[in-house]
Amino acid sequence: MGFRLITQLKGMSVFLVLFPTLLLVMLTGAQRACPKNCRCDGKIVYCESHAFADIPENISGGSQGLSLRFNSIQKLKSNQFAGLNQLIWLYLDHNYISSVDEDAFQGIRRLKELILSSNKITYLHNKTFHPVPNLRNLDLSYNKLQTLQSEQFKGLRKLIILHLRSNSLKTVPIRVFQDCRNLDFLDLGYNRLRSLSRNAFAGLLKLKELHLEHNQFSKINFAHFPRLFNLRSIYLQWNRIRSVSQGLTWTWSSLHTLDLSGNDIQAIEPGTFKCLPNLQKLNLDSNKLTNVSQETVNAWISLISITLSGNMWECSRSICPLFYWLKNFKGNKESTMICAGPKHIQGEKVSDAVETYNICSDVQVVNTERSHLAPQTPQKPPFIPKPTIFKPDAVPATLEAVSPSPGFQIPGTDHEYEHVSFHKIIAGSVALFLSVAMILLVIYVSWKRYPASMKQLQQHSLMKRRRKKARESERQMNSPLQEYYVDYKPTNSETMDISVNGSGPCTYTISGSRECEIPHHVKPLPYYSYDQPVIGYCQAHQPLHINKAYEAVSIEQDDSPSLELGRDHSFIATIARSAAPAIYLERITN
């Protein structure tokens, strides 16, 4: 019993070791399986530019992307891709596909992107795309499709982008796009469409961009685009459109771009653009327009860009409404509008001709909708004037056409500017208050947190002021008008004369180098007495006046020691200017 159990356990252990290894080898082999002449990158298979006439074999069932571009495939058979149920995108462009079986795409329900452009497809069955309801992007451009079936796109509720460009389509069936509720982009350009049924685009509630250029339309009525509430751009250039009318009972407020260039438009019906209040970009170049009515330019209230070159402008009084509108227009515009008539001004610029020949000098043209102000706020809904908000001296909206447009102003603009200025003043005051409060807070915190530092700063500033005052006082004391110095340095011979005769010459050097002689006795201190100041000051650096003669005193009255002959003596006398002048003599014996 135990032996059997051990044997079974050994067998199970061998199985547990070998099974994962075998599974890993199988998975690795499956991942490495790649068709001949193809390149595999994980779950993406590239079989491009190898002249494949059919779908290659041995493509892994777990592939999520398959590119068969630039090959020689001529036909898509039934269940051609049934084994590729994980496929997310499939590229079949630039082949020679002329027929597609209605069950060709069975089994690839997860497919989100299908590219069939640049082939030779002339017909598609009504149910061709029903097996792929998760499509987001479908490209059928550059084929030879002549018609679309009524249920061609039924069930494609997740479709976002649809390319039908450059085919041979002549009509668009009624409600053919009914189920394409999320369609954002539709390209029908470069076909042979001559007319549109009223409900051709019914159901495209989220459509934002529509291309209809290079077709064969002869007239356009905006009523053919019912309830396209989100459409922002429509391209109708290079058709054969001769007239444009509106016929809408609703306002098409979402449309921002309208391209009508390269057509045969000779005139625009009055009121055509009234249903497009938010139109920002309008292309009317390369048509046959001779003039634009006043009612038409009045409806261009939100334009920020316009092209008008290449038309047959008649430079007469009928051009004046457009001329004045362009003169006040602040957006992007062309300056190459050329006169086609009258004969004598053919080839001249419209603006130059009007000003040179005074064509509009006696014509009063107005703009009731203020289109020249629209570029300042292109994204906002247009301002519709109401008589109730006008100033007392303003005219009603219905009679606005009486006054010229250059002087027109929006009511309430001054008040808006006043509010803006008031807000700026408040903001500036608040900013100033916060700045001062911040400075005071920093000072207070510094004073509280570092009191010693604040005291040192105060002491430093006080010492600085004291030093400054001391320097000023010293500068005043050292002025040349404050003190005078008189030096006396007798020579040896003069000393002998003084000793023998009792008198002799002496030299007083005062600023200005003035000299005088005074009698000098051997004992100088007792000999000086005066009733009035000895020195009289007239002006600064004036000659020194001696007011008192020197009188000798008897030897008996002198108790001071006498000078000895034969010795060198020097006397220095200093005279200082003070309230009571006095003369001091200091004797120095060398």
From Swiss-Prot:
Signal peptide limits: 1-30
Keywords: Cell membrane, Glycoprotein, Leucine-rich repeat, Membrane, Postsynaptic cell membrane, Repeat, Signal, Synapse, Transmembrane, Transmembrane helix
InterPro entries associated with the record: Leu-rich_rpt, Leu-rich_rpt_typical-subtyp, LRR_dom_sf, LRR_TM_domain-containing
BP terms from Gene Ontology: AMPA glutamate receptor clustering; neurotransmitter-gated ion channel clustering; positive regulation of synapse assembly; regulation of presynaptic membrane organization; regulation of synapse assembly; synapse organization
Assigned GO CC terms: AMPA glutamate receptor complex; GABA-ergic synapse; glutamatergic synapse; membrane; photoreceptor ribbon synapse; postsynaptic membrane; synapse
Purpose of the protein: May play a role in the development and maintenance of the vertebrate nervous system. Exhibits strong synaptogenic activity, restricted to excitatory presynaptic differentiation.
Subunit details: Peripherally associated with AMPAR complex. AMPAR complex consists of an inner core made of 4 pore-forming GluA/GRIA proteins (GRIA1, GRIA2, GRIA3 and GRIA4) and 4 major auxiliary subunits arranged in a twofold symmetry. One of the two pairs of distinct binding sites is occupied either by CNIH2, CNIH3 or CACNG2, CACNG3. The other harbors CACNG2, CACNG3, CACNG4, CACNG8 or GSG1L. This inner core of AMPAR complex is complemented by outer core constituents binding directly to the GluA/GRIA proteins at sites distinct from the interaction sites of the inner core constituents.
Protein name according to UniProt: Leucine-rich repeat transmembrane neuronal protein 4
Species name: Mus musculus
Lineage: Eukaryota, Metazoa, Chordata, Craniata, Vertebrata
